[in-house]
Amino acid sequence: MIQKEILEELKDLDYIHGVLLIKNDGLVEYSSLSEDSNMESLGARLSIILNSISEVIKDIYNEKTECVFIKVKDDGIILIPKDNEILTILFKANNDILHKIIPIIQEIIK
């Protein structure tokens, strides 16, 4: 479960819409940060997709499975594992935003 305090901290960052956490066991958790029902349904759809490919992710990344997907407004979706090496950037990501997000991600996946 993603800690409430961390979600509250993320909520203050208006460019983040939600967080998906892929755990080492392959299960995916989603927390929406906005009241936007479109974001909620996007998170639910992403959870389903990620749950269906979580075994593949585990096979590819092995110990780096515990990751966070962050939907960033206008900047796409970013996948970041425990060691902060960005595995996947879907769409695009702004470096300034990434530098703000990474310390929070470290807290989420401790």
From Swiss-Prot:
Q: Which InterPro entries match?
A: Roadblock/LAMTOR2_dom
Task: Give the originating organism.
Answer: Methanocaldococcus jannaschii (strain ATCC 43067 / DSM 2661 / JAL-1 / JCM 10045 / NBRC 100440)
Q: What is this protein called?
A: Uncharacterized protein MJ0311
Instruction: Specify the superkingdom.
Output: Archaea
